[in-house]
């Protein structure tokens, strides 16, 4: 089992004025830490994978396909693959990002049935 030092990653990104860093990657899963610091905008594009955000610190608004929801520490939000989404209304926002990648019948990410 690999321990993931989420807090150290969050602090490092905060000191660098924000950004994203992957802390785990395997064929079906990516986990990262994303830190947004105003006034820098969230410039995300839709992703190929389903995604879950878990708020570590801060608050803001997450808009998914035109619907907005307030997010605060301890809350989570699901973003389906391909959905337009972005964070707004934050001062400093830190989230854990979990990308769930599709597995084919052999367990390989992105594999398709024969």
Report each predicted region and the residues it spans:
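Short strand-coil-strand connectors
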Residues: 27, 65-67, 90
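A cytosolic small-molecule/anion-sensing beta-strand core signal
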Residues: 56-57, 72-73, 91
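Ligand-binding loop in jelly-roll beta-barrel domains
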Residues: 81-106
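A short, N-terminal "cap"/entry segment at the start of jelly-roll beta-barrel domains
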Residues: 1-33, 40-43, 108-114
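Short, conserved beta-strand element in jelly-roll/cupin
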Residues: 47-62
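Short acidic-glycine-tyrosine-enriched beta hairpin
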Residues: 66-81
């Amino acid at each position: 089992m690999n321990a993931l030092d989420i807090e150290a990653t969050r602090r490092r990104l905060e000191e660098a004025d924000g950004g994203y860093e992957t802390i785990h990657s395997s064929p079906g899963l990516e986990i990262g830490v994303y830190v947004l610091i105003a006034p820098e905008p969230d410039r995300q594009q839709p992703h190929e994978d389903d995604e879950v955000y878990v708020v570590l610190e801060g608050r803001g608004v997450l808009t998914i396909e035109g619907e907005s929801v307030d997010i605060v520490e301890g809350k989570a939000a699901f973003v389906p693959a391909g959905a337009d989404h972005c964070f707004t209304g934050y001062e400093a926002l830190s989230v854990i990002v979990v990308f769930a990648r599709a597995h084919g019948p052999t367990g390989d990410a992105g594999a398709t049935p024969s």
